[in-house]
């Protein structure tokens, strides 16, 4: 190979890497990739957003680590405001299994997710919504 070929080949490899990398999504590089959205979330999406805006229900964006009943601009039930819990995997699992049993008097019109695998997938998705 000629000396010109030796200089061009590394440049071509770098160029291909740059072009190929430019077509890749940037979210994983910044830790923003959401977990796969489970089908059971379709029930949640009727009332809840994942983009930071409130609907019939409060946004679920940033749910993990947030005290229950504290999203600005959303009017919570007295039960939810006074629940005294911080949303983590255990609290969400208990709540999603049976919302009324976990926080009696909350007004979310949802009976729960009985299947533990569906709850686990839903919780993983909710955890990824930062």
Description of each model-found segment:
Residues 72-93:
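Short Fe-S-cluster ligation motifs
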Residues 32-55, 60:
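Sequence/structural segment immediately N-terminal to covalent heme-attachment motifs in c-type
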Residues 57-58, 62-78, 97:
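Solvent-exposed helix-loop boundary motif
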Residues 88-130:
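C-terminal capping alpha-helices of c-type cytochrome domains
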Residues 9-17:
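Sec-dependent signal peptide hydrophobic core
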Residues 43, 47-50, 63-66, 83, ...:
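Structured segments of extracytoplasmic/periplasmic soluble domains
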Residues 19-29:
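C-terminal segment of classical bacterial N-terminal signal peptides
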Residues 1-9:
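N-terminal secretory signal peptides that target proteins for export/translocation
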């Amino acid at each position: 190979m000629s000396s010109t070929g030796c200089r061009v080949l590394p440049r071509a490899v770098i160029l291909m890497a740059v072009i190929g990398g430019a077509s890749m999504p940037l979210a994983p590089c910044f830790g923003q990739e959401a977990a796969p959205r489970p089908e059971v979330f379709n029930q949640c999406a009727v009332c809840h957003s994942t983009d930071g805006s409130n609907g019939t229900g409060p946004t679920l964006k940033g749910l993990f680590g947030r005290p229950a009943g504290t999203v600005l601009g959303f009017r919570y039930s007295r039960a939810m405001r006074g629940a005294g819990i911080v949303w983590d995997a255990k609290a969400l699992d208990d709540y999603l299994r049976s919302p009324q049993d976990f926080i009696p008097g909350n007004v979310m019109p949802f009976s729960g997710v009985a299947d533990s695998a569906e709850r686990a997938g839903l919780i993983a998705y909710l955890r990824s919504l930062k």
